[in-house]
Amino acid sequence: MYHCDHGGLLHNPNGPAIIYPDGEQFWYINGKRHRENGPAAINSAGRQFWFINGYDITDQITEWAKYRDIDLDNLTEMDKMIISLEWGNYGK
């Protein structure tokens, strides 16, 4: 399943823009991989990759979360808010 905007760019502000039958999911905003409150890519094995504004920040956010004692696999609503505030403008 694919979600696109009127210009044909992958885009879904409410969930994954791509969902494959094998369980892979990809979040996009305006054609760029982007998700502020969770991983923007989850492969069929469950591995998670974090993207903000098209930039892969998986390594950076993993280190950042360890330093702040945030469990990226079990995010609370407060964790999601902190991530959005800290990382939402990355790459802009």
Could you say what each language-model-derived stretch is?
Residues 1-92:
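Glycine/tyrosine- and acidic-biased, solvent-exposed loop/turn segments at the edges of beta-strands
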